């Protein structure tokens, strides 16, 4: 079980801890709080850091949904979004769900897979609020769902027809920007790097009927040492695309 600190007098937090099999530990490095109708994760020895929340309604993700370039974005091109083609996507390494949300906002049905129970709890809480939102709730309910568990398990268990598997394994970041530093510091100390990421490509290729997309920092080697069919480069990252069949 994952150890976490939380206020045991708060029924909502007790329910969440039981649901995700989180074990209370007064010495734990991380704390879960439930305030203003949202679940947040805090690093206890860095109280000045804001809590990490999954928020699909406001902030950076909402701004990107409204002004982020639509289907012209690199991620949209990578998964094969085009006129008349809106693929079903499994995001095998969901994290805070930002890339999954971008794809869902562009029309894709997205199944998010997340193996760390604390991160999955944050995702579930973000989905709960998004499903209830007047502006995005209807299409979020239709398009975005969560499959808790490891990618290796999920890729074997998911029975839906899946066009694309999207992978963004946690990789040691060099970026020194404040946001990346904050979130990656907290995240990497919580979940660690995805040391088994190389093992994801083969099951992903088995599940995807059309393609597998792997997001990598520009300095990272190819996943599992396998050269992609094509690469879409951005300023700091790249999307390695492994094509099985044409998008149609």
Swiss-Prot record:
Belongs to the methyltransferase superfamily. RsmJ family. InterPro entries: 16SrRNA_methylTrfase_J, SAM-dependent_MTases_sf. S-adenosyl-L-methionine binds at residues 98-99, 114-115, 150-151, 168. Transmembrane segments: none annotated. Keywords: Cytoplasm, Methyltransferase, rRNA processing, S-adenosyl-L-methionine, Transferase. It is found in: Cytoplasm. Specifically methylates the guanosine in position 1516 of 16S rRNA. Its EC number is 2.1.1.242. SUPFAM superfamilies: S-adenosyl-L-methionine-dependent methyltransferases. It comes from Shewanella denitrificans (strain OS217 / ATCC BAA-1090 / DSM 15013). HAMAP family: 16SrRNA_methyltr_J. It holds the Pfam family SAM_MT. One of its GO terms (cellular component) is cytoplasm. Gene3D superfamilies: Vaccinia Virus protein VP39, YhiQ-like domain. This is Ribosomal RNA small subunit methyltransferase J. It is an enzyme of class 2 (transferase). It catalyses: guanosine(1516) in 16S rRNA + S-adenosyl-L-methionine = N(2)-methylguanosine(1516) in 16S rRNA + S-adenosyl-L-homocysteine + H(+). One of its GO terms (molecular function) is rRNA (guanine-N2-)-methyltransferase activity.
């Amino acid at each position: 079980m994952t150890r976490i600190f939380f206020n045991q007098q708060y029924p909502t937090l007790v329910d969440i801890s039981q649901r995700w099999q989180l074990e209370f530990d007064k010495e734990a490095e991380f704390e879960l709080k439930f305030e203003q109708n949202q679940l947040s994760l805090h690093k206890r020895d860095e109280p000045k850091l804001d809590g990490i929340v999954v928020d699909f309604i406001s902030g950076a993700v909402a701004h990107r949904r409204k002004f982020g370039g639509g289907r012209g974005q690199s991620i949209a091109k990578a998964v094969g979004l085009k006129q008349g083609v809106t693929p079903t996507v499994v995001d095998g390494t969901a994290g805070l769900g930002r890339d999954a949300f971008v794809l869902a906002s562009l029309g894709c049905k997205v199944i998010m897979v997340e193996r760390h129970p604390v991160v999955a709890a944050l995702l579930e809480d973000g989905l709960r609020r998004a499903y209830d939102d007047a502006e995005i709730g209807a299409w979020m309910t239709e398009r975005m769902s969560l499959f808790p568990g490891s990618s290796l398990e999920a890729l074997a268990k998911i029975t839906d027809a899946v066009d694309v598997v999207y992978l963004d394994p946690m990789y040691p970041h060099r970026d020194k920007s404040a946001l990346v530093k904050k979130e990656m510091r907290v995240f990497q100390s919580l979940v660690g790097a995805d040391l088994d990421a190389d093992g994801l490509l083969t099951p992903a290729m088995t599940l995807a009927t059309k393609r597998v997309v792997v997001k990598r920092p520009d300095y990272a080697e190819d996943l599992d040492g396998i050269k992609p069919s094509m690469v879409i480069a951005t300023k700091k990252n790249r999307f390695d695309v492994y094509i099985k069949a044409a998008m149609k």
